[in-house]
Regions:
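C-terminal helix-coil-helix/basic helical segment that borders enzyme active sites and/or dimer interfaces
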Residues: 156, 160-164, 170, 181-237
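Glycine-rich phosphate/pyrophosphate-binding beta-alpha loops
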Residues: 46-51, 93-94, 248-255
Length: 273
């Protein structure tokens, strides 16, 4: 599959979450039954990233018993044009449509599409998520710094309306900037470890928590400081759309509550109850 990635022809979606299995991913129900040289997939996924434009989806499905939880999951690669696959885009409040709902109606997939060993899909998923939670944090930090500079320039424009009444501009912008510096300082170590081929543990959860807080603080600052300009007019449309999207950052890729639970368990060694 590497040539299609290098040429830009390959685009894969991530089929993890379900309606009843989001933060508790190990509760997923999408089923993969072995029949001869194939797996037969039945079930559905939601919030599948880029499924509408993807040519393949790496799917986390249950090959074990329902009570097997994470020990009974397998990762299987599916082509979106296989018979029985239906993709429906999900339009978000932000206006974006990068997520989709996917239905699998007895989709027959060659057993050679299994990634890793049967029953070990959880380990594959966690390996992938460390990149989503960590490398993504480093990338987004750069984007958010650029957006903060754009906001600062907008507020500094002498021809623009004054900031919202009572807004302590320097204090708000300074606080957001310090949060972004903390995110970069935390995530750079994670990115270096990933680049060196090392496995990242709960550090990725810390990166994910910081990213969610920073993402929302940047756009909350825009909403607060721009005042009425934020709510009306085409000039602020991008800010409004990005503010809506920032609401999801403490949910997607593992909610903030889940990340705190990982840190509490694996770093702080707190009791389960």
């Amino acid at each position: 599959y590497l040539p299609e990635f290098l040429s830009g022809d390959g685009w894969w979606g991530q089929g993890f979450s379900e309606s009843e299995a989001g933060s508790d991913l190990a509760a997923l129900r999408c089923r993969a039954r072995r029949q001869g040289d194939d797996y037969v997939i039945s079930g559905h996924k939601i919030w599948t990233s880029h499924a509408e434009t993807a040519n393949r989806i790496f799917l986390l499905a249950r090959t074990g018993t329902p009570e097997s939880r994470h020990r009974g999951l397998s990762m299987i690669l599916i082509d979106v044009d296989m018979p029985g696959v239906t993709v429906r885009p999900v339009k978000l409040a932000s206006g974006r449509a990068e997520l989709a709902e996917c239905f699998f109606d007895d989709v027959r997939v060659p057993a050679g599409r299994l990634i890793g060993a049967e029953g070990e899909g959880w380990a594959v998923a966690m390996y992938l998520l460390q990149y989503e939670r960590a490398a993504w944090a480093w990338l987004r930090a750069a984007v958010l710094l650029q957006r903060l500079r754009a906001l600062t320039g907008l507020l500094s424009d002498s021809t623009a309306p004054a900031p919202a009444p009572g807004a302590a501009v320097d204090e708000v912008l300074g606080s957001v900037y310090l949060d972004l510096l903390a995110l970069r300082a935390r995530s750079v170590d994670t990115v270096r470890r990933l680049a060196a081929g090392q496995t990242v543990g709960p550090e990725a959860s810390a990166d994910k928590l910081l990213l969610g807080a920073c993402e929302q603080s940047v756009y909350d600052a825009a909403r607060s400081l721009l005042g009425p300009r934020f709510l009306f007019g085409d000039a602020s449309r991008q800010w409004r759309e990005e503010w809506w999207y920032s609401r999801t950052t403490t949910i997607y890729g593992g909610s903030a509550e889940v990340q705190r639970g990982i840190i509490a368990d694996r770093v702080l060694k707190l009791p389960k109850e």
